[in-house]
Amino acid sequence: MDRRQHDYAASSGLPYAQQQQQQGPNFQQQQQPQFGFHPQHPQYPSPMNASGFIPPHPSMQQFPYQHPMHQQQQPQHLPHPPHPQMFGQQQPQAFLPHLPPHHLPPPFPGPYDSAPPPPPPADPELQKRIDKLVEYSVKNGPEFEAMMRDRQKDNPDYAFLFGGEGHGYYRYKHFLSMHPPGGPFDPPFPSSSMPMIHHPPNPMMSPSMNNVPGALAVPPIRQPPFPPFHDHHQLQQHLPQPHPFAPHARPDFDQSTHAFRGLSGPLPADVAMELNGVLGNLNGTKESIKSAKIWFMQRSPFAPALAEALRDRVFAMDDSDRQMHIVYLANDILFDSLQRRTNLHEFDNEALAFRPILGSMLGRIYHFPQNKEENQSRLEKILQFWASKEVFDQDTISSLEKEMKSGPPANTFSHSPIIAAHALQRPGMLQQPPNSNVSSTMNLEHLTNPVATQQFIPNVMPPGAFPGSIPLNASVPPPTQPPAGEKPPPYPLFPPGLIPGMVRKMQIGSGVPYSPLSPLDIPTVIPPSDTPQSEVLERVSKFFKEIGEVNPSEGPMGSESQDDYDNYERDSPQRKGGACIPPPPNLQVDPETGTYADGSTDKKSGSGRLGLGATADPNEPTQYDDVYTSYRKHRSTNYHTSMSARATTR
């Protein structure tokens, strides 16, 4: 394969060889590189080019393919392959046996766009962010890039959109994704998050779609699928272009038609799965609703599809409280977007996305039998609140209220990607047969237009989308929905924290000063007991037997015979003469207190067993009027008996 240089010269024509011999060594010195630079071609054609040879473009000199053994002679490059008849007049080539530079495919399609590809950024997170944005931009068109420029203009993580770090790599990846060598549109990324399956606008009119397997059936969401990317040039010619010098112009908002111009395609599968988890964890707490709102606002380019998924989730629920949680979430999203409006008289993208679906969603909850009266008053207050805060104009509020009170149409329930993704996780969910006892005539009154007159039925899953599933008729309510005439038991909707607030309000600032309880309000008569007195006495007697004590209500302890010591008259015997012997110390009475040394008083007949303050007659009715008095008498009797016994032994 390797041939010498004279072989090329021998095969060339004679006139050209003689012309090369006449030029001499001066021309060879002129062709040698000086100071390490490649030789520059003359600006004007030399006499040697008078035979029809055109010098190459300077951009083609970036591929010199110089070799040390062949630097004495510079080859002549052509901008395009010459005619076959001119092969005999060309100079012998000094290249090794490989393709010359003008036969190598350039890295870019353009004839002069020969700059080397920019390297990826050093930050792997930035490179991942750029690749993800390029993927979504290719799948959704230039509107997505314009929207991201408008929304992320103050975010330093997206500085590559405005000439920052990684801008060249972003443009290079975007260019390669837009112009792949395999065809007009061949996406280089695996379509894991952006499915490119385009179903026909009406699956009911296409019976061939019934054979699509369930893993590939991702239905559209009320919008026709976006066209392939090679048709975007025709699409851009019909769309109004924003003014290039408007500083606050939003390219995703059509000022003429006031319609959302974001991502109107189907919801990606990964976003649908995330939304399914967010709504599964949604409850009535403020933290849960706030976190769900933040998640929604971070994915605001998919606002129409997300709003559709929220509406479909409301129709799939049979719990009115969870339905109201989604309404509260939509309320927070609308008010968060309201604060970001530059013009209060123009709807933001979130308001435009929720406006077509709010009427049917509110109508579903408004006519739901569970907690019907409470939810109706709540929904009416929410609409009035939106009107007062100018979330929507008065015409829109009136339209929403009319649609809410008229009831949701029977064909609004459909399967969104979030429900489809949820069904993929639980394959047996749709395999239950519908309730045969539920009459379909109750929904016929809501059907204003027959199915045959409808041109587009959005969000209808093909009947064979899931293996083993059954087609779900739109006119039949879900099987889990309770009958309309059956009212569930009332649920205690008592707001937490109400009682402490009421108590605090009564304590502070109520104006009522403190006043003691009046004695007149205290009852003087003990109310009669329902328990018979005999049962009470029996239980008291049983109690004293268990503790080993004597029941005071049954009388004093001891025998019926009176103690001689207790009945002893303590009067001093009268003496008839001799010295007077004083009584012992235990029988001397204290003149100040009138008691003996043991604490007892001077006893008279019948009062030996009574304590301090006891009357002389133990048979008086006041002594044994209750068990407490008798018990006190009994205990004091034992005390005085023991004290007297001790005093006697001394």
UniProtKB/Swiss-Prot annotation:
SMART domains: RPR, SWAP
Record PROSITE patterns: CID, SURP
GO biological process, one term: RNA processing
Biased segments, Low complexity type: 18-43, 61-77
Extent of the SURP motif repeats: 129-173
Places the protein is found: Nucleus; Nucleus speckle
Gene: SWAP1
PANTHER family: CALCIUM HOMEOSTASIS ENDOPLASMIC RETICULUM PROTEIN (PTHR12323:SF0), SR-RELATED CTD ASSOCIATED FACTOR 6 (PTHR12323)
Protein name, entry field: SUPPRESSOR-OF-WHITE-APRICOT/SURP RNA-binding domain containing protein 1
Residue stretches making up the CID domain: 267-408
Gene3D superfamilies attached to this UniProt entry: 1.25.40.90, Surp module (1.10.10.790)
Described function: As a member of the SWAP1-SFPS-RRC1 splicing factor complex, modulates photomorphogenesis by regulating the gene expression and pre-messenger RNA (mRNA) alternative splicing of a large number of genes, including those involved in plant responses to light signaling. Involved in calcium homeostasis, growth and proliferation.
Biased composition (Pro residues): 98-123
Phenotypic consequence of gene deletion: Reduced sensitivity to red light and day length-independent early flowering. Plants lacking SWAP1, RRC1 and DRT111/RSN2/SFPS have pleiotropic phenotypes due to altered alternative splicing of many pre-messenger RNA (mRNA).
SUPFAM superfamilies: Surp module (SWAP domain)
Keywords of this entry: mRNA processing, mRNA splicing, Nucleus
Gene Ontology CC, one term: nuclear speck
An example Gene Ontology molecular-function term: RNA binding
Annotated segments matching region Disordered: 1-126, 548-650
InterPro entries assigned: CID_dom, ENTH_VHS, Surp, SWAP/Surp_sf, SWAP1_C
Residue spans of biased composition, Polar residues class: 638-650
Principal location: nucleus
Quaternary structure note: Component of the SWAP1-SFPS-RRC1 splicing factor complex which modulates pre-mRNA splicing to promote photomorphogenesis. Interacts with DRT111/RSN2/SFPS and RRC1 in a light-independent manner. Binds to the photoactivated (Pfr) photoreceptor phytochrome B (phyB) in nuclear photobodies.
